[in-house]
Amino acid sequence: MKAFAVLVVPLLLTSPAWGQSELKTPPTSTRSTAPAPTGIHAALTVEGHVLVGDVAPDFDLTSSRDRQVRLSRQRGDWVLLVFVPDRDGFSDYSTVNHDLAAIGVRLLGVCRDNPQTLRTVAEKNGIPFEMLADATGEISSMYGFYDGARRCCIPGFLVLDRRGVVKLAVSGQVVPASQVLSLTSLTVAAP
């Protein structure tokens, strides 16, 4: 028994040291990485995000009415900020703009387009609210509504209270304007 203890004790004392001196290689990653975008799009691959309860980040964009719209200047009003992949996504909102105004909500649309095109679309289709030109996708990206790989806005919307705080956020799906109106009405009416 004494001989067994003499052999086992040195083995137990040396095994932790032996395990620690063993070279360990880091696990290999199985993730494939796509080539990194370049130019302005490199900065847009890291999407921001805005959560319910956050103060909406300020921005300044040119509207379809050829004026600069600063989000922080809209404080005092409820704001529905709608992001669409292309300008055709705004046509459905013309039907609810009057109802939104009746409950004290200002509608602002954002898409990745230029101001001149948005002005032409507004005049041609009689769009009664301001569409904001996010030509580079920078603002959409800051809000988490930009797909850098496809270089387009992700559909969704935010409802901002009079202090600019996000009260409702929906991202990644096209919601019919009538349902957006209902959700916005419920949000504005909530205590």
What does each model-found stretch correspond to?
Residues A5-S15:
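Bacterial N-terminal signal peptides
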Residues V69-Y93:
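Short active-site neighborhood of thiol/selenol oxidoreductases, capturing the structured segment around
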Residues S72-Q74, F145, G172:
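Residue-level structural signal for beta-strand termini and adjacent loop
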Residues P128-F129, F145-L158:
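Structural micro-motif
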Residues L23-L71:
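N-terminal "domain-start" segment that seeds a small globular fold
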Residues C153-P191:
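Thiol-/selenol-based redox modules, centered on thioredoxin-like
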Residues R87-E130, G137-S141:
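Structural microenvironment flanking redox-active thiols in thiol-disulfide oxidoreductases
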